[in-house]
Amino acid sequence: MVRGSLGKLASRALSVAGKWQHQQLRRLNIHEYQGAELMGKYGINVPRGAAAGSVEEVKNTLKNVFPSEKEIVVKSQILAGGRGLGTFKSGLQGGVHIVKAEEAESLAAKMLGQILVTKQTGPQGKIVSKVYLCEKLSLVNEMYFAITLDRNTAGPLIIACSKGGTSIEDLAEKYPDMIIKVPIDVFKGITDDDAAKVVDGLAPKTADRQSSIEQIKKLYELFCKSDCTLLEINPLAETADNKLVAADAKLNFDDNAAFRQKEIFAMRDTTQEDPREVAAAKADLNYIGLDGEIGCMVNGAGLAMATMDIIKLHGGTPANFLDVGGSASEGQVVEAFKILTSDDRVKAILVNIFGGIMKCDVIASGIVNAAKQVDLKVPVVVRLEGTNVDQGKRILKESGMTLITAEDLDDAAEKAVKASVK
């Protein structure tokens, strides 16, 4: 189904008892201006523009880059979508504006250092540390283009639509027949025929066909050579001078490729990320922040998902996904507890460990040491089973800690939910 494929483009979700919650994947997401610079290196047509982090830099950019432009596009730079319809906490409406050149400096001053709230940031919003000043393009057509990874074809999948400029979900609903999918053979790479199919699906009105084919091939080259997990151009614009231009782009990169993409990963802006996820990544923990009240620490992704489901079934809401893995050290367990207790929304913590490679006594020692370092103000429910379970239970019993023990997962979830509402 088209919608199923499109759902993989920009985000995924955790299914918790039949309800979907946002999941931030372990991947690098870079700012729009950084993506434009990267695309330019591959010969991809992008608008002329420059980023500025202060009013003085804005003034210099207007003078040196846009000395004769009458209108300028001023774009707030945050790692979230929906900027155009967002609202600054200062009251300014919209994170993207087209203004007269002489007004750009004063507008940028109202954006820089302010918090922008969009449908993707949550009510806390994100701080705007830079603005991206771009030339105003004369557009004759807007299209949609994306490359993502498809499990069904076990390779890159190009998705294109002759309509663009709005969310792909809306496009899929309004114009399902206009969306095409072109799977690419990962061994052969993109061929002229593949690129031609994409161009035919985009149906540009005036752009040169061969030049358009070359642009598609360059986008695919960027996707592969940069280890992207997503390259989304919306809109892929057709300009009055008969060119295809990546007017707005979103690029995500596989975290597993950090060792060979050092230049790209140096672009990471941790100020835009959840500080809990940043701390977890440093400790080599698989953590994803959610918006519930029960903190979870589990070993194994499957068990973690099941734990979240059962919490939901008992009427609770998980505050996070946290998989400590099968070889976590005592220090990592301590760090995990620090992350869980740093969330003010957490009213109870559920530790659910099935010891295979992960030993229950290591988890127990970590819990005890964490209690010594962290002021535990919320109830902790512990369910241990598996390797060294007796040693683990003994360590917890002899610690003198006030813990709520559970015999199985269902019992643990029920007790955690009850503890969270006291």
Curated annotation (Swiss-Prot):
Pathway this chain belongs to: Carbohydrate metabolism; tricarboxylic acid cycle; succinate from succinyl-CoA (ligase route): step 1/1
Coiled coil feature spans: none
Residues bound to Mg(2+): N234, D248
The organism of origin for this protein: Oryza sativa subsp. japonica
Identification of the protein by name: Succinate--CoA ligase [ADP-forming] subunit beta, mitochondrial
Classification via InterPro entries: ATP-grasp, ATP-grasp_succ-CoA_synth-type, ATP_grasp_subdomain_1, Succ-CoA_synthase_bsu_CS, SUCC_ACL_C, Succ_CoA_ligase-like_bsu, Succinyl-CoA_synth-like
Domain ATP-grasp, first and last residues per copy: 36-279
Class of this enzyme: ligase
Keyword Transit peptide: yes
Positions annotated to bind substrate: N299, G356, I357, M358
